[in-house]
């Protein structure tokens, strides 16, 4: 018992020292900005012990968050989640390591939309969950909130505090392969999307789980999937319809965070896809829609980005566009070794040559911290 108390006392001392020294970290000079907090990164392995990759990400890079996946995209084997007991131990150990090394907790994220996209899947012994399309078809927001609350309780029990859901893409194209044909969208009616997303978010909040609206400014009209390559929605997008859920949910204060889409729309930006577009994120989302919260990129290793840009260049462009947190999943069928470290080096270089502003990055870090402060104990 004494040894336990001594260990706890040591952790608290470390936490206090680190927290004190970094409490104003976002206001420091560029060279000492805690840039790792801008990263949400994936990793391999189902445990912390003996995992050098995890230790480096948490203790050296000091990432702001980690994202969990059930399966490895290359091998099909368990990546981070193999059983309810295992994932509880993993997330507990991750938080303990983060507390020891950084004095703060981690944002631990996963995609748990219900139905086809559910990292806590029935294969692992979890209860089945209805796809968003089924909830939208039923048209019963009370039932959606109840289902979301049940799902959220499971997510929180697993130690995941940030659910990258709900999808608020409007099903403009019934043959859309990215979200619509997979049952990931609530409806082709934007008002029904708003009603269902509101209920879903409220259920998650009641369970103590943060959420993320996705994929801004809309992926429901596309004919192709941005996981695999370039997606142009210039001729198919209907912004009046597709932006309605964001406009409503931002106004209601229900947008904990917003995830971007890697879709290109010449009507918004003639040069860059949404994730990398100042016109789309900074001018439209933050300007016209008056969104002040955290923006997280979709995975920067997806085909739509990877085939056109390197992860370093994409990261700089995303930050210039007013994205706050960069998602690097390391689970798109390939792994880029040292990607997190390379991105940090690229950001430092961009700060030095003036392509990035320390003031803007400090604001992004504050948004990450604001979201993290809402993690329930």
Predicted regions and their residues:
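Sec-dependent signal peptide recognition
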Residues: 2-8
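Second-shell residues forming the walls of enzyme active-site clefts
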Residues: 49-53, 77-100, 192-356
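Alpha-helical scaffold segments that flank or form the walls of functional sites
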Residues: 139-160, 242, 317-320
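Mid-to-C-terminal alpha-helical segments outside catalytic/metal-binding sites
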Residues: 351-377
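Surface-exposed loop and adjacent secondary-structure segments within mature catalytic domains
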Residues: 114, 122-134, 150-240
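Structural recognition of the beta-strand scaffold that forms the well-ordered cores
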Residues: 37-42, 64-70, 105-110, 116-118, ...
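C-terminal motif of bacterial Sec signal peptides marking the signal peptidase cleavage site
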Residues: 15-16
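N-terminal hydrophobic targeting/anchoring segments and the immediately downstream early-domain regions
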Residues: 20-124, 326-328, 370
């Amino acid at each position: 018992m004494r040894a336990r108390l001594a260990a706890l006392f040591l952790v608290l001392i470390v936490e206090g020292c680190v927290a004190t020294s970094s409490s104003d970290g976002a206001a420091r000079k560029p060279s000492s900005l805690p840039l790792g907090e801008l990263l949400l990164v994936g990793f391999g392995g189902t445990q912390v012990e003996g995992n050098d990759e995890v230790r480096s990400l948490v203790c050296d890079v000091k990432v702001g968050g980690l994202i969990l996946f059930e399966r490895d995209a290359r091998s099909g084997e368990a990546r981070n989640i193999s059983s309810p007991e295992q994932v509880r131990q993993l997330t507990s150990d991750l938080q303990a390591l983060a507390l020891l090394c950084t004095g703060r907790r981690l944002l631990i994220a996963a995609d748990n939309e219900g139905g086809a996209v559910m990292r806590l899947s029935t294969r692992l012994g979890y209860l089945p969950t209805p796809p968003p399309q089924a909830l939208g078809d039923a048209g019963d927001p009370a039932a959606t909130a109840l289902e979301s609350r049940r799902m959220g309780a499971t997510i929180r029990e697993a130690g995941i505090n940030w659910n990258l859901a709900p999808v608020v893409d409007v099903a403009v194209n019934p043959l859309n392969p990215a979200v619509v044909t997979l049952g990931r969208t609530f409806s082709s009616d934007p008002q029904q999307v708003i009603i269902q997303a509101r209920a879903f978010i409220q259920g998650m909040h009641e369970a103590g789980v943060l959420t993320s609206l996705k994929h801004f400014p809309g992926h429901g009209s596309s004919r192709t999937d941005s996981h695999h390559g370039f997606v142009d929605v210039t001729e198919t997008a209907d912004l009046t319809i597709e932006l309605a859920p964001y406009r409503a949910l931002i106004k209601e204060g229900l947008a904990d965070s917003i995830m971007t889409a890697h879709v290109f729309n010449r009507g918004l930006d003639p040069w860059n896809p949404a994730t990398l577009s100042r016109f789309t994120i900074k001018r439209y989302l933050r300007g016209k829609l008056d969104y002040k919260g955290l923006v997280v990129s979709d995975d920067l290793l997806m085909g739509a980005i990877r085939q056109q840009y390197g992860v370093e260049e994409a990261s700089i462009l995303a930050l210039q566009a007013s994205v706050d947190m960069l998602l690097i999943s390391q689970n798109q069928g390939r792994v880029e070794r040292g990607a997190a470290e390379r991105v940090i080096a690229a950001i430092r270089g961009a700060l030095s040559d003036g392509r990035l502003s320390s003031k803007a990055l400090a604001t992004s870090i504050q948004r990450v911290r604001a979201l993290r402060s809402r993690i329930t104990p």
